[in-house]
Amino acid sequence: MDTQTLNFNKVHFVTSAPDIRHLPNDGGVEIAFAGRSNAGKSSALNTLTKHKNLARTSKTPGRTQLINLFELEPGKRLVDLPGYGYAQVPLEMKLKWQKSLAEYLQRRESLKGLVILMDIRHPLKDTDMNMLEWSSHRKLPVMLLLTKADKLSPGPRNNQVIKVRQAVAELGPQIQVEAFSSLTQIGVEKLAQTLTGWYLAGADDMTDGEQAPLEE
């Protein structure tokens, strides 16, 4: 299956949860999508799965307030995490989202890979770097998608990818940086191939009896 990818359009919605205590049992392999509230996270999920309305998109950043779980097949799930970094919401709500996000990232043993999305024109904000540094500490594989790549012509686009790759290189080889566009399909096949590899590797880990370590 090295040259094949999973059929992501077979995905179906499982549940929405305000925190990890309301999620299904912590087993199988989960790959989570995270990003700032205007990074195009929902659009990327919809494009990957070829489902127009799988993840709700909105012109209002910060619409995703819950942890949303989708299943590809038994034991293989996609997770749409609450967006971070949006200032124009009440402080109490922002803190609630941050706690929910942190708990999932730190305690969910079935989390085997993280897709972090950033607008290619405004990458590597402080909150993005915090996510990358945490992932590096946990040795979690990361695919960093520079979204809205269609907004730049090929030359500047490629330069931005190179610049970001250089900036995150010190965090380790487990971070893969790619341009992505839901509109023009740039990077969609690479995303599908990478996620397929993570799912298969995670399933192998479970077969071998290995578990991801819990963080403090």
From Swiss-Prot:
> GO molecular function terms here?
GTP binding; metal ion binding
Q: Which domain of life is it from?
A: Bacteria
- GTP-binding in keyword set: yes
* Keywords annotated in UniProt: Cell cycle, Cell division, GTP-binding, Magnesium, Metal-binding, Nucleotide-binding, Septation
The record, for Gene3D superfamilies, names: P-loop containing nucleotide triphosphate hydrolases
Concerning Pfam families, the annotation shows: MMR_HSR1 (PF01926)
Q: Does the keyword Cell membrane apply?
A: no
EngB-type G domain ranges (all copies): 27-201
Cofactor(s) listed = Mg(2+)
Name the InterPro entries on file: G_ENGB_dom, GTP-bd, GTP-bd_ribosome_bio_YsxC, P-loop_NTPase
| One BP term from GO | division septum assembly
One GO CC term, this protein: cytosol
What family does the entry list?
A: Belongs to the TRAFAC class TrmE-Era-EngA-EngB-Septin-like GTPase superfamily. EngB GTPase family.
Q: Which NCBIfam families does the annotation name? A: GTPase_YsxC
Function statement: Necessary for normal cell division and for the maintenance of normal septation.
Q: What HAMAP family would the database entry show? A: GTPase_EngB
Name assigned to this protein = Probable GTP-binding protein EngB
